[in-house]
């Protein structure tokens, strides 16, 4: 009888742990494939390719403190985002780590929301360093390392973002101190 009670108590504790993890950890992902046909030049070409294969994990440490991780399996594979953020007030949140820069309106949008494989305008590609069109900035997928202070004011009628970024792009430490 004692061993049955012990097993039930252990089972209850395990269920509590599993339920807590389910409430606090979110896993997600998506993939986008494409087909390209090009008849310019001497030879026509066509190909299928894997544009994006993304894995995401979000952890809720407390009601105010969270963390986020995003990894891309497409091409060479790399960490796209890894950051933690703390919400001091509904109007004031601080984020530190590697994340999308808030330089344009389009850059923070997910490709799933835009619903196009090549989803950014040429200006955003250049300014945010998404596709490597700026030779000085390189191709950083519109991401960088740094700290971001952001929030919404006046019942979400005014949003602000203030960031101090590394300037080197993703997965690189600062080269000029």
Enumerate the predicted regions with their spans:
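Bacterial Sec-dependent N-terminal signal peptides
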Residues: 1-12
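Outer membrane beta-barrel
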Residues: 14-167
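Short, intrinsically disordered, charge-balanced linker/junction segments flanking boundaries
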Residues: 168, 173-177
